[in-house]
Amino acid sequence: MAAYLLAVAILFCIQGWPSATVQGQVMPFMEVYERSACQTRETLVSILKEYPDEVAHLFKPSCVPVLRCSGCCSDESLKCTATGKHSVGREVMRVDPHKGTSKIEVMQFKEHTDCECRPRSPGDVNNGRNPEEGEPRARFPFV
């Protein structure tokens, strides 16, 4: 089986990765595997989650796109973790509902530049729940 997967990977490297762009087309295994790997991806981040002390204001839009680490690691004991970060500015409209005013301003957000799979710390497991999404983990995912 391992030899077969290696042969398929080599074949795709030679011919190029197929792209599942046609609606309803099945995405090939190697493309699924590559696209699900731990890497930076554009993610929408809630401004109020990044700036919880700003609850007196409204923001338009209420979330902004930034690159964040996300994806699957080869083992449940590993977690996709940011290893590099920098700050980026995003223009948003800050609305003060009490004064009836608004202004466009630049707010800073952390953007991930590099990711890798690293061992989970004991605090990463929260009673069988995924701390990033709050969704329960499947106890027997392949049964």
From Swiss-Prot:
GO terms for cellular component: extracellular space; membrane. One of its GO terms (molecular function) is chemoattractant activity. Residues 1-24 form the signal peptide. Keywords: Disulfide bond, Growth factor, Pyrrolidone carboxylic acid, Secreted, Signal, Toxin. The modification Pyrrolidone carboxylic acid is found at residue 25. Pfam families: PDGF. The keyword Transmembrane helix does not apply. Disulfide bonds join 38-80, 69-115, 73-117. Expressed by the venom gland. InterPro entries: Cystine-knot_cytokine, PD_growth_factor_CS, PDGF/VEGF_dom, PDGF/VEGF_growth_factor. SUPFAM superfamilies: Cystine-knot cytokines. GO terms for biological process: induction of positive chemotaxis; positive regulation of angiogenesis; positive regulation of endothelial cell proliferation; positive regulation of mast cell chemotaxis; response to hypoxia; sprouting angiogenesis; vascular endothelial growth factor receptor signaling pathway; vascular endothelial growth factor signaling pathway. The keyword Ribonucleoprotein does not apply. Residues 115-143 are annotated as: Disordered. It is found in: Secreted. The N-terminus is blocked for N-terminal sequencing, suggesting a Pyrrolidone carboxylic acid at Gln-25. Residues 130-143 have a biased composition (Basic and acidic residues). Snake venom VEGFs that may contribute to venom dispersion and prey subjugation by inducing vascular permeability and hypotension. This protein induces an increase in capillary permeability when intradermally injected into mice. Also provokes a drastic hypotensive effect after intravenous injection. The hypotension is mediated by nitric oxide (NO), which is produced by VEGF-activated endothelium NO synthase. Also induces angiogenesis in vitro. PANTHER family: VASCULAR ENDOTHELIAL GROWTH FACTOR (PTHR12025), VASCULAR ENDOTHELIAL GROWTH FACTOR A, LONG FORM (PTHR12025:SF5). Belongs to the PDGF/VEGF growth factor family. Snake venom VEGF subfamily. Homodimer; disulfide-linked. Interacts with VEGF receptor-2 (KDR). This is Snake venom vascular endothelial growth factor toxin. It comes from Protobothrops jerdonii. The lineage of its organism: Eukaryota, Metazoa, Chordata, Craniata, Vertebrata.
